[in-house]
Amino acid sequence: MPELRTCHGPYRGRECPVCGKPGKILMNEREVDEVSRTLAAILRHDPERYHIRLDSHGYARIAGIVTVLRKYKGMKWITFDHILSLAETDPKGRYQVSGVLIRAMYGHTIPVDLSDLPEDNIPDVLYYQSSAAEAPLVKEAGIYPSDKTWVHLSGTYRRSYVSGLYHIDDPFILRIDARSMIDSGHDIYRSSDDIYLTREIPPEYIQDAEPEEVTLTEEEKMDIDRVRNKNKKDQ
């Protein structure tokens, strides 16, 4: 993950996007990775491990997270502002800050009520990544949460395909008729610019997507390799 710096505000990488100069470093690449992993563990998966309490909508007090990082990760230097800067510059829009609170916007494996997320500006069509082997069963049975507590959808074919590459070599993309779902009373929530959440998708709203050619950026290739290599080590 790129380092976190500040100049005309916080940013990821070396050069300030405003003036082009290298700003003051807030976290190096290793620290960004470590803090990001800890945030994910607390806000998405296992807050009790770190003695953090989430409210019903998944929010935790930032001060409590700072205490965890100082106590358990040896980051005596970390402050409230470091967490704010990390959340503000997260390239995938994973976090939402509300005053002194922070939450993850998606990716939960623990029950969290995200029904306060916006329901406006939902695209008519959304996309879901599967595999060629599983797609026929998915179209017959519908889509339900598996390792997460919400079904995650993408706003574009490309985003869905790239997301799938973190898990399998050749994702098979399904097209979701989001407009018909909403018209029939199903709730779909917008958790970021290109990620949408719902509880389940009945089979009548699912069909094969028209294949599109997807070319990965070098940054995407590196990030996919990093995640897949880590997953192999963790197995």
From Swiss-Prot:
GO terms for MF: NAD+ poly-ADP-ribosyltransferase activity; tRNA 2'-phosphotransferase activity
Assigned keywords, A-Z: NAD, Transferase
Pfam families associated with the record: PTS_2-RNA (PF01885)
Protein name as it appears in the record: Probable RNA 2'-phosphotransferase
Basic and acidic residues: bias regions: 223-235
Coiled coil (UniProt feature): none
Record-listed E.C. numbers: 2.7.1.-
Biological processes per GO annotation: tRNA splicing, via endonucleolytic cleavage and ligation
Ranges annotated as biased composition (Acidic residues): 208-222
Job description of the protein: Removes the 2'-phosphate from RNA via an intermediate in which the phosphate is ADP-ribosylated by NAD followed by a presumed transesterification to release the RNA and generate ADP-ribose 1''-2''-cyclic phosphate (APPR>P). May function as an ADP-ribosylase.
Chain intervals for the UniProt region annotation (Disordered): 208-235
Entry-linked HAMAP family: KptA
Family according to the record: Belongs to the KptA/TPT1 family.
Broad EC category: transferase
